[in-house]
Amino acid sequence: MNLLMLTFIICGLLTQVTKGSFEPQKCWKNNIGHCRRRCLDTERYILLCRNKLSCCISIIISHEYTRRPAFPVIHLEDITFDYSDVDSFTGSPVSMLNDLITFDTTKFGETITPETNTPETTMPPSETTSSKTTMPPSETATSETMPPPSQTALTHN
């Protein structure tokens, strides 16, 4: 009787082992791919499975797998805007400025003011610096008073 029970247990385990080893392994998300040595012509390689096998996913769309639902269609006629809170916005960050007139401050000469449309002449600022520049006398630094550059980064004075 014990021998008979042992053979039933072994046969039951053998069917489980053979079922897992002879069936092609599944891979990828929701087990839609198959692990193979070479992908078929209608399949695409995605990643590597165990034992140097490739995870091959079919290029042809199969309806047996659940797919992501399509995006809902938005009709432009259904979109409405409420303009009741919008004042007369000119596009300028500061209110009541006219964006059609720009002022160039880098050029000197004749500019037109937008209010009167009359030309005005402006002159560049006069140069107040002299041609001679004097430098204060600098102290001569010796190697005894100043440490080398590698040491100056380490000292905190």
Swiss-Prot record:
Compositional bias ranges of the Polar residues kind: 141-157
Keyword Thylakoid attributed: no
N-terminal signal peptide: 1-20
Protein family membership: Belongs to the beta-defensin family.
Top-level lineage group: Eukaryota
Keyword match Signal: yes
Disulfide bonds: 27-55, 35-49, 39-56
Positions of the UniProt region annotated as Disordered: 109-157
Keywords associated with the record: Antibiotic, Antimicrobial, Defensin, Disulfide bond, Secreted, Signal
Gene Ontology biological-process annotations: defense response to Gram-negative bacterium; innate immune response
Gene Ontology cellular component list: extracellular region
Name of the protein this chain belongs to: Beta-defensin 125
Gene: DEFB125
Gene3D superfamilies, alphabetized: Antimicrobial Peptide, Beta-defensin 2, Chain A (3.10.360.10)
Subcellular location: Secreted
Listed InterPro entries: Beta-defensin (IPR050544), Beta_defensin_dom (IPR025933)
Organism for this UniProt entry: Pongo pygmaeus (Bornean orangutan)
Function: Has antibacterial activity.
Ranges annotated as biased composition (Low complexity): 110-140
